Amino acid sequence: MASASRLPPLPALRDFIHMYRLRAKKILSQNYLMDMNITRKIAKHAKVIEKDWVIEIGPGPGGITRAILEAGASRLDVVEIDNRFIPPLQHLAEAADSRMFIHHQDALRTEIGDIWKNETARPESVDWHDSNLPAMHVIGNLPFNIASPLIIKYLRDMSYRRGVWQYGRVPLTLTFQLEVAKRLCSPIACDTRSRISIMSQYVAEPKMVFQISGSCFVPRPQVDVGVVRFVPRKTPLVNTSFEVLEKVCRQVFHYRQKYVTKGLKTLYPEELEDELSDDLLKKCRIDPTTTSIRLGIEQFADLAEGYNEQCIRYPGLFLYDYTNKLHNLEDLSKEPNALPPPVPIFAPAPTIDSADNTWSLKNFNCS
């Protein structure tokens, strides 16, 4: 019987792919990571150790899967939509001595928190305000075509502490096109700064742990890849719902090269755009001639919280879409979701007496 962290002899990954006649599908943006040294590096940077539980998204032929099992994970659940990969993954599961479970599902439609919901042996939950992280991980070498919608889905779940994040600040390690990875981690005033920069950095601390050359993949993509590790923040940096902040960020970054006021006005009907956008900028003390990439997290927090107040004052405003010329607040105010989603409320953090440990948005540095 294999030891807890050692797999029995297996065919080399290239031979494995040839054995099962696996070819990457361009339509699914599939690229196989062939170098086991790199897959082991991903598992190492994800900080997988013995006894940990792991969910892997999109294992494909199982390169990272092997590395996770070698690292000593006591349970590994893989989520794979492509039925061609199920037989080779079953081969790995048989070699893994009952540590590996296969879920033949679409990751975008899978609530990964349900995978362990009824597992009484899962690692203990850890309070969100605790400095320790749960002995759980989510890892994935994502197809490029689902990477952005999937990370938004997971960041939203983090913000509501649902899914696997009901168990605590479960870290997330994923691969992205290098340009997307840079956007996720982009500091203020960088050309790579975007909506996804704010959405990731307000609820987590993303860090690009290393880059992978496109030459390491088969077939070779036209871009390099960045591996990003996300550690959820103990306290989000914005006090609104995920949806309110996302809408503000989407509109503000819509005109990246224009003054911030131009994007902000698209949040409002034409008859209110000047009044409400001016009021919001004045309240937030933001120069209307600045650009979106020069706004920090604290300023986006002010904008989102101010816009949330306006949406409560003007029912239906949250549902307003400037591209729909038929939208009017009177009709929208009668819709079931006329008011914005409420701010998530969680147990307060333990009181900190030390002045040195006082948390402040002003101390935030996204670089």
UniProtKB/Swiss-Prot annotation:
Is rRNA-binding a UniProt keyword of this protein?
no
Q: Where is the transit peptide?
A: 1-16
Classify the main location.
mitochondrion
List keywords of the entry alphabetically.
Methyltransferase, Mitochondrion, RNA-binding, rRNA processing, S-adenosyl-L-methionine, Transcription, Transcription regulation, Transferase, Transit peptide
- Species of origin reads Caenorhabditis elegans
- State which Enzyme Commission number(s) the record gives: 2.1.1.-
- Tell me the protein's name: Dimethyladenosine transferase 1, mitochondrial
Checking PANTHER family in the record gives: DIMETHYLADENOSINE TRANSFERASE, DIMETHYLADENOSINE TRANSFERASE 1, MITOCHONDRIAL
Q: Does the keyword Ribosomal protein apply?
A: no
- Provide the leader sequence positions: none
Q: What does this protein do?
A: Probable S-adenosyl-L-methionine-dependent methyltransferase which specifically dimethylates mitochondrial 12S rRNA at the conserved stem loop. Also required for basal transcription of mitochondrial DNA. Stimulates transcription independently of the methyltransferase activity.
Taxonomically, the superkingdom here is Eukaryota
- Which CDD domains does this chain map to? AdoMet_MTases (cd02440)
One GO term under biological process is:
transcription initiation at mitochondrial promoter
TM spans (from-to) = none
Q: Which residues bind S-adenosyl-L-methionine?
A: Q30, N31, Y32, L33, G58, E80, D106, N141
Molecular function in Gene Ontology: mitochondrial transcription factor activity; RNA binding; rRNA (adenine-N6,N6-)-dimethyltransferase activity
Checking SUPFAM superfamilies in the record gives: S-adenosyl-L-methionine-dependent methyltransferases
| Protein encoded by which gene | tfbm-1
From the Swiss-Prot or TrEMBL record, state where the protein is found: Mitochondrion
Q: Sorted alphabetically, which Pfam families does this protein's record hold?
A: RrnaAD
Q: Which enzyme class, named as a word?
A: transferase
